[in-house]
Amino acid sequence: MTSADFDIVGQHYSSLRRPDPRIAKIIHAELMDAESIINIGAGTGSYEPPGKTITAVEPSETMIAQRVDKENTTVFCASAENLPFESNSFDAAMAILTIHHWSNWQKGLQEALRVTKSKIILFTWIGMPEKFWLSDYFPEIKYIDKDLFPSLEQLSTVLGDVKVTSVPIPKDCTDGFMCAYWSRPTSYLDSRIRSAISTFSRIPNLEKGITKLKQDLANGKWFEKYGYLQSLHEFDFGYRLVVSDKQFA
């Protein structure tokens, strides 16, 4: 997805893609020792840890315009594949649910390695669980995003040895990415919510799935089949924190 695409689908990111504090805690723990951090594909600035010197890189002017001004933060309109910085400029790099939007993820990671002295933190996704109910209504999600996100094995070909941590998604997740509303099915009927989830912009014949979901919620079929999910507090939907550290080498 290009910066021009995000100038359209990213219009409500700041209100709908608010960082979830439980996910933030996991990300920030890995960045604790870094003083200077580059946030690649920074979007509106979600998950940037406080108290650090942040350099945010984002190609979309629409996303940049939604950022809240923060102390010790500098924003550059640039792409992951061509970072305008000298080698070893930053202690660490972070890239949060962004790598699938890069035009060349291998080059983007090579650039991250070049400008970073130590850690690279990726929050990414490794594929849809077989039993996630959303694929009943939008079967395309099983492969649309999976073809865009590199696998852990592919990431390792560029990053070398990595540490991988599962990140379960809370039932009341405040960051409105694709699986965030797994326990709140009516949310997917809201076009504004869908507008902040890039996956939906790539699904053909979207209204067919919306209509079926609306019907199943109205007649109780969804609750008969999946109502048990609403008693769970969190669920693993394939989101992972991947950490590359030059000290691993």
Residue ranges and their predicted role:
Residues 94:
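A conserved beta-strand element that flanks and buttresses the S-adenosyl-L-methionine
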Residues 38-82:
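Class I SAM-dependent methyltransferase SAM/SAH-binding core
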Residues 106-120:
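A short glycine-rich, Lys/Arg-flanked "PGG" loop and its adjoining helix->strand segment in the class I
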Residues 163-249:
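Conserved Class I S-adenosyl-L-methionine
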Residues 1-35, 46, 63-66, 119-152, 175, 179, 183, ...:
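Conserved class I S-adenosyl-L-methionine
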Residues 34, 90-91:
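Local beta-strand N-terminus motif with an aromatic residue
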Residues 97-101:
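Short catalytic micro-motifs in class I SAM-dependent methyltransferases
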